Amino acid sequence: MLIPSKLSRPVRLDHTVVRERLLAKLSGANNFRLALITSPAGYGKTTLISQWAAGKNDIGWYSLDEGDNQQERFASYLIAAVQQATNGHCAICDTMAQKRQYASLTSLFAQLFIELAEWHSPLYLVIDDYHLITNPVIHESMRFFIRHQPENLTLVVLSRNLPQLGIANLRVRDQLLEIGSQQLAFTHQEAKQFFDCRLSSPIEAAESSRICDDVSGWATALQLIALSARQNTHSAHKSARRLAGINASHLSDYLVDEVLDNVDLATRHFLLKSAILRSMNDALITRVTGEENGQMRLEEIERQGLFLQRMDDTGEWFCYHPLFGNFLRQRCQWELAAELPEIHRAAAESWMAQGFPSEAIHHALAAGDALMLRDILLNHAWSLFNHSELSLLEESLKALPWDSLLENPQLVLLQAWLMQSQHRYGEVNTLLARAEHEIKDIREGTMHAEFNALRAQVAINDGSPDEAERLAKLALEELPPGWFYSRIVATSVLGEVLHCKGELTRSLALMQQTEQMARQHDVWHYALWSLIQQSEILFAQGFLQTAWETQEKAFQLINEQHLEQLPMHEFLVRIRAQLLWAWARLDEAEASARSGIEVLSSYQPQQQLQCLAMLIQCSLARGDLDNARSQLNRLENLLGNGKYHSDWISNANKVRVIYWQMTSDKAAAANWLRHTAKPEFANNHFLQGQWRNIARAQILLGEFESAEIVLEELNENARSLRLMSDLNRNLLLLNQLYWQAGRKSDAQRVLLDALKLANRTGFISHFVIEGEAMAQQLRQLIQLNTLPELEQHRAQRILREINQHHRHKFAHFDENFVERLLNHPEVPELIRTSPLTQREWQVLGLIYSGYSNEQIAGELEVAATTIKTHIRNLYQKLGVAHRQAAVQHAQKLLKMMGYGV
């Protein structure tokens, strides 16, 4: 819940001097990316901008405090301010900020700018007190914001110092409007106006000018002088002389003498007590100070000129001038030290009553009241956890004594989930073990079951499926039906374990159950996770179309619940890329992989390993070895500079081994084969992939017998576990083994099996990457004209893809080839005496490559009738009557030239 006063522009007071000269300068603010107002405290920055903002509608205001260094809090308020300015235009971004469903501030801002692209009128965003931001991540994100914000948006920043926002670059590019302390300082005329509206007896212009000069036009000093003069303690000039040369850091003594010592004791205590509140309203004041009518008291303090300002148009929320507020808080620690804990407790209770638990925690921590802090956490901690208030929770839990955690195991569980969310798996188990050792009877009942559900999640994340299964089963046996969150966790873990074991049907059922429970209870990240797992399982079973449809459901869930910035989104777009690649939709596959990298842009580069491998796979399918090599250099650098799960390493190794196969790099393959992991089993699609990598390397090295043993065992496992996609891949690799070993009939047998199975999987690119060896076999099968219709159609499609991406020059009879052919001593006399034109040679090459007449016309960009003429001419010159004879003739020519076909 956001505090309204932080999003309210200060009310323009009646007795303030209108800064016409500065307002004139600000009138052109819409021509700049950034308007920067900087000065020490008390120069009137906020007052000036509130005057400028008066009457503007498309403006959002965000007043910072120290707590806004939390990235999530900063994001929530900033987006809320934009929503305020645009009347709710950025709904997607607002939901993402509220639910903390974004990877980073920069990715959230990128989404914001997408939505603002449809907002065409001028827009202003004011951020007050930016000097309070010390978080470098926020600074970097705001630099990104300024670089990419729409042209019609102006950011207005108020700060006591020069913020780290790339100011120099903006200044050089004339995109910065600056107002500093020298310009903010009051002129003689403004000082005269100020005193005239503050003092009952006007002072001479010369007098006010001298006072203005004495304090260098410092607005706070002028206000203090007016206050002293009204209280008749000193003449205005005496006060001015005393303040001359004093800056904001040396005001304490003056404020004690001239303000606190000149109010009655009740007002003094009111000021000191209320100052602990960063913002205040009637209810807070009544509870903290004991005053019966808080609103009336606040308005009275405001009338006395005691540096209190309204924060919103309703007049409900107030705050002290930062300079005066800091002074009062310091004095409160001196004068009311004994009462201070009780004052903070009262503030915490009042904030809780108004529904602001995070503000209440701030005061409970300040009070050092562990019991109050415990009670707040017991009631609100999980809500804060689900809203990613992780740093606040961590600070709060550290402030509680261990005994308090033991008395409330829910808080131990919360601390453990906090650790798990930060990938501190070892610490989770240590904490839970310690708690179980020290809490009586914890090893039985619901809490123990919740511990086990969390332990199961940690175990599966840490690569221990057997332990995860044991713990998940224990949790599900002990958890009551109403403990939905832990039941969702345990069910999901059990489904993932079965996935790892290759028990795909049972795993799919559990993941569907997880999805149903997660949707019912709005646990959206587990709903998304279950859909991703379902898609992977269906892919492994060979049901790629159903996997596609499941992915569509996942994308719909992401859009509906605004989960775009979750790291899991990368997982989804990556498996979508894998599916598109299998179907030879390479451009779309590459785009998906790149969008996955974009989702992870704010994470460590190592997290992008799998998407990078997918990009390399696309390059390999296109036969673009130069690009693949460039990307492989980066992939191998990442592999050498990170620790990865075995599945990730297997995927990375796949593209490396395929590249070595395509470039005949036997040395690299042999070196890799000596050092790579050889899994004990091959009972899931992850392990099958690694063993396939090994078999491919063995085939490249001519170790056919070893590779055949591996592939036959893989096929046996794949058939028994119904890993149909893996079986399809294995058959293709076995085909290459038989082809290279000269076992042509075996090669044809398994290729026919692979083509038949591809009717179910839809595989195209898995055939294509095998290159010319695959093309030669498919040409022969097509020439035999014995394939069933579906397999015939697929074979022709695969052949077209190979010809498009893996063209060898002899398939196209280029000029150099034809010249060497005509000079060959064994060339048929008919060709020598009646040579084909260059275009006819091209057509012959395409016929040999399996192209139809229409496809040849498309390839050469000529009319189909023209192609028919070329074919008729080349048939006549070659002395053949039909297409198959032309293919056989081309094959003879290629063999004569030394090509193994």
From Swiss-Prot:
Residues 853-872 bind DNA. Keywords: Activator, ATP-binding, Carbohydrate metabolism, DNA-binding, Nucleotide-binding, Transcription, Transcription regulation. One of its GO terms (molecular function) is DNA binding. PROSITE patterns: HTH_LUXR_1, HTH_LUXR_2. Residues 829-894 form the HTH luxR-type domain. ATP binds at S39, P40, A41, G42, Y43, G44, K45, T46. Activated by ATP and maltotriose, which are both required for DNA binding. InterPro entries: P-loop_NTPase, Sig_transdc_resp-reg_C-effctor, TPR-like_helical_dom_sf, TPR_MalT, Tscrpt_reg_HTH_MalT, Tscrpt_reg_LuxR_C, WH-like_DNA-bd_sf. GO terms for biological process: positive regulation of carbohydrate metabolic process; positive regulation of DNA-templated transcription. SMART domains: HTH_LUXR. Positively regulates the transcription of the maltose regulon whose gene products are responsible for uptake and catabolism of malto-oligosaccharides. Specifically binds to the promoter region of its target genes, recognizing a short DNA motif called the MalT box. Belongs to the MalT family. Monomer in solution. Oligomerizes to an active state in the presence of the positive effectors ATP and maltotriose. This is HTH-type transcriptional regulator MalT.
